[in-house]
Amino acid sequence: MTLLSGANSVGYPSQMPAKRISWRRLVALLPNSIGLSLKPVTPHLRDLHLVQRRLQDDFLGCEALWTIFMAAAWSYRYRTRLRPFPSHWNTIDLVFNTLGDAPRLEVLQQQLMHCDYQACSPNVVRLLTDILVDQADRVSLSSLRPCEFQELYAHLGMSPPKQPPTQIFEVRTGKGNEKGEAYASLRQENKESVRLGFYGCKLEKVYALLNSQNSLDNGKYLELTCDINEALARSKPQAGVGGSRCGSILRCVAVVEFVFQDNETSRDKKQVIIKDANTMQVSYLLLYGQSCNEYAMERQIKLMAEPARELLNWLERYHKKAISLGVGLLIVSSMAHFGSTFFRLLARTGFYVFKRGIL
């Protein structure tokens, strides 16, 4: 109710008692030119509050989880990387369009702090809820402070890596995670066989590694190493999310706990092959983030120090492909006239690649 004072016009006493009029009646009496800011009811308001709470609890953990999801979704191998596929989405095209409309999490947090609940479309809210709330109830990431890194190394019984990570996240499994419950039961029965290993990989592989129960189907396996520096060398850099606190160029090393059950090992016992996903669990994630300028400078320094190292690394790592390439170049060169200087050079190159592949 609104209180209106008495009028002083002719015929109306100035000491008339105040008259009450309802708010609805007052709005009806106002001219149409005076607009009132009546905000519509925001859909998915409860979901936005849940997302806001997760961002407030651990912003870095949410951003890492969102970055890992985006890396898997944008991969051309999304069919194997994005597992399980978000339940409310039918096609990858719809996921792409929604990711294109989604704001940066830092911007979203500022909008929610100022009670701006109209900035995100319903699809964006639904996807944020799926990844940061529903999916995080099963597997979530908890960020560690830099001062806790040394304590973690001592707890795991490992030497600090030569290149310190920019962020470390503890992987936590929630209730209803069947994979986590199965591993916890196996771990309890085989406490003396529990081991730790390191797995360096591209960021797009981490989503399925954390969430999928069938990540090692169809003959797939993980090759773990006991040296974290070697694992980091195997991790290929991948573009992250622009403006992310995790970094623009990211490399990832997973600290994997597993139950040793007569697994295959290398001759020097430094690598272990894991073929059953139920016998392992990712305990921590180490992220190495760089800006684009830092990555370009590092790459330029490596190329200046060893100009041909990239080609030699490729030949050593993919010797089978090198043999195929060398044979192909030899065949192509043999089809031309022997007097051609170009094809002579091509033949010599093919023979060199072929020789390196065999060696």
Swiss-Prot record:
<keyword id="KW-0520">NAD</keyword>
<dbReference type="GO" id="GO:1990404">
    <property type="term" value="F:NAD+-protein mono-ADP-ribosyltransferase activity"/>
</dbReference>
<dbReference type="InterPro" id="IPR041400">
    <property type="entry name" value="PARP16_N"/>
</dbReference>
<feature type="transmembrane region" description="Helical">
    <location>
        <begin position="325"/>
        <end position="347"/>
    </location>
</feature>
<keyword id="KW-0812">Transmembrane</keyword>
<dbReference type="Pfam" id="PF18084">
    <property type="entry name" value="ARTD15_N"/>
</dbReference>
<dbReference type="GO" id="GO:0140807">
    <property type="term" value="F:NAD+-protein-glutamate ADP-ribosyltransferase activity"/>
</dbReference>
<keyword id="KW-0472">Membrane</keyword>
<keyword id="KW-0256">Endoplasmic reticulum</keyword>
<comment type="similarity">
    <text>Belongs to the ARTD/PARP family.</text>
</comment>
<keyword id="KW-0548">Nucleotidyltransferase</keyword>
<comment type="function">
    <text>Intracellular mono-ADP-ribosyltransferase that may play a role in different processes through the mono-ADP-ribosylation of proteins involved in those processes. Required for amino acid starvation-induced mono-ADP-ribosylation and subsequent formation of Sec bodies - which are stress assemblies that promote cell survival by preserving components of the ER exit sites (ERES) during amino-acid starvation. Catalyzes the mono-ADP-ribosylation of Sec16 which is essential for Sec body formation.</text>
</comment>
<feature type="binding site">
    <location>
        <position position="221"/>
    </location>
    <ligand>
        <name>NAD(+)</name>
    </ligand>
</feature>
<keyword id="KW-0346">Stress response</keyword>
<dbReference type="GO" id="GO:0043539">
    <property type="term" value="F:protein serine/threonine kinase activator activity"/>
</dbReference>
<dbReference type="GO" id="GO:0005789">
    <property type="term" value="C:endoplasmic reticulum membrane"/>
</dbReference>
<keyword id="KW-1133">Transmembrane helix</keyword>
<keyword id="KW-0808">Transferase</keyword>
<dbReference type="GO" id="GO:0140806">
    <property type="term" value="F:NAD+-protein-aspartate ADP-ribosyltransferase activity"/>
</dbReference>
<keyword id="KW-0328">Glycosyltransferase</keyword>
<dbReference type="GO" id="GO:0003950">
    <property type="term" value="F:NAD+ poly-ADP-ribosyltransferase activity"/>
</dbReference>
<dbReference type="GO" id="GO:0019900">
    <property type="term" value="F:kinase binding"/>
</dbReference>
<dbReference type="InterPro" id="IPR051838">
    <property type="entry name" value="ARTD_PARP"/>
</dbReference>
<feature type="topological domain" description="Cytoplasmic">
    <location>
        <begin position="1"/>
        <end position="324"/>
    </location>
</feature>
<protein>
    <recommendedName>
        <fullName>Protein mono-ADP-ribosyltransferase Parp16</fullName>
        <ecNumber>2.4.2.-</ecNumber>
    </recommendedName>
</protein>
<feature type="topological domain" description="Lumenal">
    <location>
        <begin position="348"/>
        <end position="359"/>
    </location>
</feature>
<dbReference type="GO" id="GO:0030968">
    <property type="term" value="P:endoplasmic reticulum unfolded protein response"/>
</dbReference>
<dbReference type="GO" id="GO:0005635">
    <property type="term" value="C:nuclear envelope"/>
</dbReference>
<dbReference type="GO" id="GO:0016779">
    <property type="term" value="F:nucleotidyltransferase activity"/>
</dbReference>
<dbReference type="GO" id="GO:0140804">
    <property type="term" value="F:NAD+-protein-lysine ADP-ribosyltransferase activity"/>
</dbReference>
<dbReference type="GO" id="GO:0071782">
    <property type="term" value="C:endoplasmic reticulum tubular network"/>
</dbReference>
<feature type="binding site">
    <location>
        <position position="199"/>
    </location>
    <ligand>
        <name>NAD(+)</name>
    </ligand>
</feature>
